[in-house]
């Protein structure tokens, strides 16, 4: 029952559409991959254990699922190879062992920039570490829920959703104040600030109150 609940949470958080490609890293025998196949345009599973990959392919055939592919290899290295070949998943599911994601996997996720990452974890410590690394790469932790797959012990399975921040609404602008007010007396005017931001970023400052909220000026 708890395993079914975990899969339902992962599917719900992924918010998959028929236009989406889903990449499932550390997919095992393809349980989560195949559970998402019906809602997605295409699903891709990656697993390092050869027999598990064969079982995943057999499970797809037995269930009449034709939009699933499975690859055998290290999750991080395989993800980097898929990225180099042009694969750009909309949703990525990761279900790593207790040691969490390796550096290659973090880098692959950063390069692929899926809009959603569903992280299934069996170790809260490595989960916290990896979430912090993904936040540095543009993701926001939206939800976290627990599933008691290990009753009568301290271990817990956690399902987290990380969402890519909108690059249009989150832009870092390096402002050289000295350059902005060079040859000007006193503080820069609001008009000068708007012109400077427009020149440097192509964005229009819509309201003075928004600028004040950010800068205090």
Q: Model segments located where?
A:
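Rossmann-like S-adenosyl-L-methionine
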Residues: 1-186, 191
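Short aromatic/hydrophobic-glycine micro-motifs
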Residues: 139, 202-203
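Residues in the helix-turn-helix
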Residues: 209
């Amino acid at each position: 029952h708890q395993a079914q609940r975990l899969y339902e949470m992962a599917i719900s958080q992924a918010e998959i559409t028929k236009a989406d490609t889903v990449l499932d890293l550390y997919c095992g025998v393809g349980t989560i991959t195949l559970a998402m196949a019906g809602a997605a345009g295409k699903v891709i599973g990656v697993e390092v254990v050869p027999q598990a990959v064969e079982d995943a392919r057999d499970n797809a055939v037995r269930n009449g699922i034709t939009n699933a592919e499975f690859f055998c290899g290290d999750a991080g290295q395989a993800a980097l190879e898929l990225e180099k070949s042009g694969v750009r998943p909309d949703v990525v599911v990761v279900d790593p062992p207790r040691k969490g994601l390796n550096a290659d996997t973090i880098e692959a996720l950063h390069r692929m920039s899926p809009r959603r990452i569903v992280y299934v974890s069996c170790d809260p410590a490595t989960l916290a570490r990896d979430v912090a690394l993904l936040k540095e790469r543009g993701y926001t932790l939206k939800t976290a829920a627990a599933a008691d797959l290990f009753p009568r012990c301290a271990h817990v399975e956690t399902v987290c959703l990380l969402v890519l921040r909108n690059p249009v609404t989150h832009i870092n602008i390096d402002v050289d104040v000295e350059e902005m007010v060079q040859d000007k007396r006193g503080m820069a005017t609001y008009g000068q600030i708007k012109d400077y931001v427009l020149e440097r970023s192509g964005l229009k400052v819509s309201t003075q109150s928004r600028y004040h909220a950010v800068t205090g000026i």
